Amino acid sequence: MFGASGKGLILPECRVFPPSSGISMRITMIGSGYVGLVSGACFADFGHQVICVDKDAEKIEKLELGQMPIYEPGLAELVTNNARHGRLSFTTDLKGSVQGADAVFIAVGTPSRRGDGHADLSYVYAAAREVAEAVNKFMVVITKSTVPVGTGDEVERVMRKTRPDGDFAVVSNPEFLREGAAIRDFKHPDRIVIGTSDARAKAVMQDVYRPLYLNRAPIMVTERRTAELIKYAANAFLATKITFINEVADLAEKVGANVQDVARGIGLDNRIGAKFLHAGPGYGGSCFPKDTLALIKTAQDHQAPLRIVETVAAVNEQRKRAMGRKVLAAAGGDLRDKTVAVLGLTFKPNTDDMRDAPSIPLITALQDMGARVVAYDPEGMEQARLVLNDVTYAADAYACAKGADVLVITTEWEQFRALDFAALKAAMTTPVLVDLRNVYSPEEADRHGFAYTGIGRG
């Protein structure tokens, strides 16, 4: 359980997920984007009564019809099932949804602020003001959005200024969901971090997470500022790990080593671990680029610069731009009037998220070199059309490869792991494969008559 002190208590993990305890909380989730919708649907699946709020009336209408604003495996079924059973509903009425709630989660966007890289917290503070106006009993207000250290203090200040008589506690509860595996991550977490020193808030959070608590999921209760820093530090560390193995991959190419074997050799060390040691075109997505930049700015603001993280962010941006030069070299040094087929657009598989995807600077670089780009992605092409110009989109991998001079694998979707090389070769003008995810081995590509370029294979 949470314990009297409420600090640093971690429970051992158990993988069997128990049925709900029967304690149903009234939860309001402000923000029906990726974090809010996944979290709200999972809380409803625990047996809680959940209302997801969003100012976007069209999004709410579509959710009520069972239409998802994002692609996440299993989410549509989870939302539909819990809505059908009356545990999950959607509204644009923030005030009405907050009144009577036991816990209100703020899960709105915190994009990088234009010009300086700080997190834009205007949506968080606006939500806090509206929640304060609606408070009509003791309420726990939880920041689920990824926010810089000290944001919880400011949320509380904003709320107290709006409602000096309001009875509420502000808690930090950062999310650690991976796109493409978010539902499993929520229900089988590595840890749950709760940032509060308020005894009543601890009791409410224990009831909110009771199914996981009964399942002995690791729960850590700490101070609010510490919880906020844990989230940023975790993402920065993972970004560092990715960037490290990418730089080792560059060295491996120069010295005649194999980065995949290097990664396995160091990953078998329990002190290091194998996760996030997969060399590729650089990290992207909605979290790592934004959060590392926000952490860098926070550290600079407090005269405690994080030089390692600064370097990681800079190296990652350089790497994404450098992938175009790798394709250029594979094509013989000239891409003018050549066709490049790009398989995979999203920043990772099992999502439709194009935010900061490595494919964006890659395709832009290829176009700058004079190439025509044809692309295919199982889920990301609708979003890609919003951020990429002058790209032709294909119906499948083989239509994408038709007439191509070079084929580039940018995202390791499962369907790209078993491509028919004979069909690809027959479709292409020249059989050149640039594998930015090391899906295939050079030997396999060579066996099928392809000139192969991978990552970190000297």
Over which residues does each language-model region extend?
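Structural/interface elements that position substrates and couple domains in central-metabolism enzymes
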Residues: 22-458
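Residue-identity detector for glycine
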Residues: 3-8, 22
